Amino acid sequence: MAKTSTKKRVKRVVSDGIAHIHASFNNTIVTITDRQGNTLAWATSGGSGFRGSRKSTPFAAQVAAEKAGRIVQEMGMKNLEVRVKGPGPGRESAARSLNNVGFKVTNIADITPIPHNGCRPPKKRRV
């Protein structure tokens, strides 16, 4: 049987990009893109080995950000702009850990969507 030819993925060299941190109450998703918005690497708290209530901790967000950061460091990325979205507990720790990995963070922006009285929010918990 003939061997099927598969294209080897070309390693891209990108010097600066954007880190999108989506911090919900249950999970934190870190996506690192180039300037055009093409995804280079991503990681989540759940995918980093945390399950249940540990997924929503600042430490889990830190581990996810470091995991995504190491992947794009191999591509030669040095400068990052950080965009944070959501009210979750992993907001600051994920942004701080990207700085600790060795990136030069040029800008931190909060792009959390704020409704002009749109959908009804979830009811308050009675514990």
Swiss-Prot record:
It holds the Pfam family Ribosomal_S11. GO terms for biological process: translation. GO terms for cellular component: ribonucleoprotein complex; ribosome. InterPro entries: Ribosomal_uS11 (IPR001971), Ribosomal_uS11_bac-type (IPR019981), Ribosomal_uS11_sf (IPR036967). Keywords: Ribonucleoprotein, Ribosomal protein, RNA-binding, rRNA-binding. Part of the 30S ribosomal subunit. Interacts with proteins S7 and S18. Binds to IF-3. Belongs to the universal ribosomal protein uS11 family. This is Small ribosomal subunit protein uS11. It comes from Nitrosococcus oceani (strain ATCC 19707 / BCRC 17464 / JCM 30415 / NCIMB 11848 / C-107). The gene is rpsK.
